[in-house]
């Protein structure tokens, strides 16, 4: 394809200083943008309103919109969303359209190419066209509210937008469908893993690749999947792979290519102290979810909304509570295509015949540069991702089609559902977003998997499939009646933490990769133990116990491991021998509590890092190379080869150290790692092990990955963290690299039907994305102190939660 060279591989986004400099937000500069913060009191006339609307704010800035009509409430929601998060809304729209370079410059071109291949704009147009006239009216009214803000503040935009030189276009109703499509796209996993698998195949070879791609602890190796790559020379046939991997890694860093780490839980009356149901959710996203409450004469709802989309995605309406978590869906596939170029014509091989690829011209407007014009090509499997012209293989991105989809209407209907039965009716029709919906009313709870999942004729979709062989094509989609669901289970609870939610051999495939099972196992332990209330659910969300530590002990003591490990330790040099024995004894005594002040937690995690490096770095290094980065990156997305080898795979070829003449086995590598963990601890934490603390190694770092409105570029001092990637209080790190962790936009919600006002919400992001606002960074302090906010639905309680100060929006002339 005609495409300029990609920029070199970047491990992470720009540093905080670079970002803040680009956006003009550093230090006192925000003071000059104080008039970009909308007022919270007074009167503002707005054209488009029929009657007066009241907007009150609570102590965290969350709005209560009171109106006599739903029309005016939607208009005001658009105005409020834009006032709080216009930069995020603009960035999400540009990202979804493949136009981010207009805001960010040439560094975003590779992201734009990838997003134009996904063609979310076309998907959004289809979904909007299929929406009901009622929903289209809702989106039109909401768009007018957003545009009322854009007109009023056209010369007083937040600093990031104002200094960029980009002038936001007015909001269109279809843009809200586009925001939903981007949200749905981010719920699917495996695209980044497929690209990483190709990178790993180049380094390790297809013969060893299956060992690096486990699906779940009890799943066999995907050897038949790996066979699809045999006979291919990826380095020469797919020369653009490193650049593609770098572009997708940018999106993965922002949690845009699958975002594990969410969890939700519903407990029935028999598991509740009050005798009434409870619901809890914990989500992580690439963007801030904004708390909001709407109260009209015929419609009331409170919960978490996504600015740009006038629908509450998780919340409570006085009768029903609902939330969602990532189902870890694999409903996207890459297809390898054999390419042949003759002059300006590009053809691809399909079942023995060369077919012309459909060409379309794309123009990229780039901030500070001339427009870039390129040609993209479509095959029967989707759009080809950009490759140099000498590539003999291409990668086509195949995504589900959603003609006739009712997801947008169904999501709105969910916010009006009064019971679990109606919630099932609504969520079964959400086919465009693959999530675990969990919902509750006072006496009942339910779970429904939504989405659209391809039927693959052959293969699992774990690796790119040969597009020239129709055996691997999709054959329609799984019957929605096969989608997993449950209602009022005998156990009395329903919970999901991105684990495999289907038994092996089930009649449809949701995914081939799942997150570490220990989070869901711990959730089951806590949910199934005794009775609960909102306080115990808050404690559950903050739980820092890992069950992986106990599995590690069982592995050490297994009949086939205990004696060989002892012999391997005995064979170490004297100094290492004592360290290994000491480490082993400490790990066997460790209770799995990953408190930030725990010395044993520090030693345990040092061992995890050491054994990963001792096992794989000789094959996949150097550390700065694309293979090691892909390997470490995969461990953040799903159950990893690091964990799989730690607990099993005794016959793996990766146990042998290629840098030594002898052949090592698993006990030998474990013995080295036990000694190495102690040595690393002494080097990093000092010789006095009484002063060791996990939180001295494992720290929140700011800013979290952020990019031109996608995430808030807040800078603050590092903070000690507990937990890890296997705990309910999720603090993942790069397994095989370092212990740093980040806090993306996160939100927790608890609904306790036993309380007079059931709904409580906590977000790590401030209500505002504007650095000049008092509510830009205050979410972090509330998050770390566990300071939930109550969103009451009874009018007599509004004053206590929101006060009496209000902004009155009145019809303008």
UniProtKB/Swiss-Prot annotation:
Active site residues per record: 262
Keyword presence, Hydrolase: yes
GO CC field: periplasmic space
Top-level taxon of the source organism: Bacteria
Record's catalysed reaction(s): an N-acyl-L-homoserine lactone + H2O = L-homoserine lactone + a carboxylate
Enzyme class (EC, first level): hydrolase
Gene3D superfamilies found in the cross-reference section: 1.10.1400.10, 2.30.120.10, Glutamine Phosphoribosylpyrophosphate, subunit 1, domain 1, Penicillin Amidohydrolase, domain 1
One Pfam family here: Penicil_amidase
Major localization listed first in the record, in broad terms: periplasm
GO molecular function: hydrolase activity, acting on carbon-nitrogen (but not peptide) bonds, in linear amides
Function comment: Catalyzes the deacylation of acyl-homoserine lactone (AHL or acyl-HSL), releasing homoserine lactone (HSL) and the corresponding fatty acid. Possesses a specificity for the degradation of long-chain acyl-HSLs (side chains of seven or more carbons in length).
Record-given protein name: Acyl-homoserine lactone acylase QuiP
Organism: Pseudomonas putida (strain ATCC 47054 / DSM 6125 / CFBP 8728 / NCIMB 11950 / KT2440)
């Amino acid at each position: 394809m005609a495409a300029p060279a990609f920029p070199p591989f970047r491990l992470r986004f720009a540093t905080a200083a670079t970002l803040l400099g680009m956006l003009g937000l550093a230090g006192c500069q925000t003071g000059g943008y104080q008039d970009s913060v909308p007022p919270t009191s007074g009167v503002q006339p707005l054209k488009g309103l029929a009657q007066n609307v009241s907007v009150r704010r609570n102590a965290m800035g969350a709005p209560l919109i009171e109106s006599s009509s739903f029309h005016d409430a939607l208009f005001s929601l658009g105005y409020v969303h834009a006032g709080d998060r216009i930069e995020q809304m603009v960035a999400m729209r540009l990202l979804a359209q493949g136009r981010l370079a207009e805001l960010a410059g040439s560094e975003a071109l590779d992201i734009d190419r990838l997003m134009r291949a996904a063609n979310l704009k076309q998907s959004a147009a289809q979904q909007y066209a299929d929406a009901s006239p009622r929903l289209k009216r809702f989106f039109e009214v909401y768009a007018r509210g957003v545009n009322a803000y854009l007109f009023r503040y056209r010369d007083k935009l937040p600093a990031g937008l104002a200094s960029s030189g980009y002038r936001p276009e007015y909001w269109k109703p279809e843009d809200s469908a586009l925001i939903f499509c981007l949200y749905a796209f981010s719920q699917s996993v495996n695209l980044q893993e497929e690209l990483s698998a190709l990178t790993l195949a180049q380094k390790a070879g297809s013969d060893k690749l299956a060992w690096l791609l486990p699906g779940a602890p009890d799943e066999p190796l995907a050897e038949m999947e790996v066979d699809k790559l045999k006979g291919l020379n990826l380095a020469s046939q797919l020369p653009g792979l490193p650049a593609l991997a770098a572009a997708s890694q940018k999106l993965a860093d922002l949690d845009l290519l699958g975002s594990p780490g969410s969890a939700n839980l519903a407990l029935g009356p028999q598991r509740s102290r009050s005798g009434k149901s409870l619901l809890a959710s914990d989500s992580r996203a690439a963007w801030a979810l904004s708390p909001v409450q709407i109260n009209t004469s015929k419609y009331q709802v409170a919960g978490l909304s996504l600015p740009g989309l006038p629908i509450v995605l998780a919340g409570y309406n006085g009768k029903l509570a609902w939330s969602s978590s990532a189902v870890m869906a694999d409903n996207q596939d890459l297809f390898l295509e054999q390419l042949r170029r003759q002059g300006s014509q590009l053809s691809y091989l399909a079942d023995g015949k060369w077919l012309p690829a459909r060409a379309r011209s794309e123009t990229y407007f780039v901030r500070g540069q001339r427009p870039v014009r390129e040609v993209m090509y479509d095959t029967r499997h989707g759009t080809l991702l950009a490759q140099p012209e000498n590539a003999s293989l291409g990668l086509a991105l195949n995504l589900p089609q959603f003609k006739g989809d009712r997801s947008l209407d169904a999501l709105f209907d969910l916010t009006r559902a009064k019971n679990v039965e109606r919630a099932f009716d609504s969520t079964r029709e959400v086919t465009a977003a693959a999530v675990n919906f969990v919902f509750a009313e006072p006496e009942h709870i339910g779970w429904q998997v939504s989405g659209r999942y391809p039927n693959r004729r052959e293969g699992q979709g774990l690796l790119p499939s040969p597009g020239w062989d129709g055996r691997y094509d999709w054959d329609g989609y799984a019957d929605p009646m096969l989608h997993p669901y449950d209602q009022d289970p005998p156990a009395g609870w329903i919970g999901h933490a991105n684990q495999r939610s289907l038994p092996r051999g089930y009649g449809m495939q949701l995914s081939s990769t799942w997150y570490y099972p220990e989070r869901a196992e711990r959730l089951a332990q806590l949910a199934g133990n005794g009775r609960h209330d909102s306080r115990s659910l808050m404690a559950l969300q903050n739980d820092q116990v890992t069950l992986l530590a106990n599995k590690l002990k069982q592995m050490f003591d297994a009949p086939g491991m205990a004696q060989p490990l002892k012999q391997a330790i005995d064979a170490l040099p004297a100094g290492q021998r004592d360290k290994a024995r000491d480490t082993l004894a400490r790990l066997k005594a460790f209770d799995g509590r990953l408190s930030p002040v725990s010395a044993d937690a520090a030693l345990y995690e040092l061992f995890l890092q050491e054994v990963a490096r001792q096992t794989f770095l000789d094959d996949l290094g150097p550390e700065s190379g694309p293979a090691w980065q892909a390997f470490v990156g995969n461990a953040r997305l799903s159950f990893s080869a690091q964990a799989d080898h730690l607990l099993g795979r005794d016959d793996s070829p990766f146990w042998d150290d290629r840098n030594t003449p002898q052949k090592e086995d698993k006990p030998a590598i474990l013995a080295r790692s036990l000694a190495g963990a102690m040595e690393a601890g002494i080097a990093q934490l000092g010789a006095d092990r009484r002063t060791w603390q996990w939180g001295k190694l494992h720290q929140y770092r700011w800013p979290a990955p952020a990019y031109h409105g996608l995430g808030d570029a807040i800078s603050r001092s590092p903070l000690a963290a507990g937990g890890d990637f296997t705990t309910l209080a999720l603090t993942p790190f790069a397994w095989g690299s370092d212990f740093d962790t980040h806090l993306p936009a996160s939100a927790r919600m608890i609904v306790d039907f036993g309380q007079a006002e059931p709904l409580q919400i906590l977000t790590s992001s401030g209500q505002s994305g504007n650095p000049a606002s008092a509510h830009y960074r205050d979410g972090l302090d509330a998050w770390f102190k566990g300071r939930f906010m109550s969103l009451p639905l009874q009018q007599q309680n509004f004053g206590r939660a929101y006060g009496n100060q209000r902004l009155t929006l009145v019809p303008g002339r």
